[in-house]
């Protein structure tokens, strides 16, 4: 879904806007940009460096596309109809992509994306190994760690032993 025919007034409402100015920039230009972009009703407005942008985008966007593309290649994907619901839809939404565009984006950010793929491979191996060994305690610990990591990443982690939200 791209191009003018899919445009709508609220397309960016509530979404983050990240500006990556040159190393030396005029704060007045940033203020001008915030004002010029305000009709789009972005949910947040951030300023960052190119290096940090590329690192975070490798994780938040590009990795999701790689994982989705890899996941859908399972032979089981061709047999899913009638069995799948929200989880399948969530994980495969971005698998149908523009290969030309994403190849270029991935190659331009290969170092960051390769690092993130390595993290996922390591974690998947931990799950596979726990399952192969029949190690229920390890599997439970891995799942709990993932749940905690999600809450921490979203800024809503609470640990009663520590007395509140972290």
Where in this protein do the model-derived segments appear?
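Substrate/ligand-engaging "lid" and interaction regions
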Residues: 44, 56-93
């Amino acid at each position: 879904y791209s191009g003018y025919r899919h445009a709508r007034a609220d397309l960016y409402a509530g979404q983050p806007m990240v500006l990556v100015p040159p190393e030396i920039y005029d704060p007045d230009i940033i203020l001008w940009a915030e004002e010029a972009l305000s009709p789009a009703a972005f949910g947040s407005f951030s300023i960052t460096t190119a290096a940090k942008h590329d690192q975070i985008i490798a994780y938040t966007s590009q990795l999701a596309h790689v994982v989705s593309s890899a996941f859908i290649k399972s032979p089981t994907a061709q047999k899913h109809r009638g069995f799948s619901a929200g989880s399948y839809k969530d994980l495969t939404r971005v698998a149908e992509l523009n290969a030309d565009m994403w190849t270029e984006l991935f190659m331009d950010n290969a170092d960051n994306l390769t690092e993130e793929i390595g993290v996922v491979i390591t974690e998947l191996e931990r799950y596979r190994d726990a399952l192969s060994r029949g190690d229920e305690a390890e599997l439970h610990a891995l799942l709990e760690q993932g749940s905690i990591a999600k809450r921490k990443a979203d800024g809503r982690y609470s640990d009663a032993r520590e007395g509140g939200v972290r």
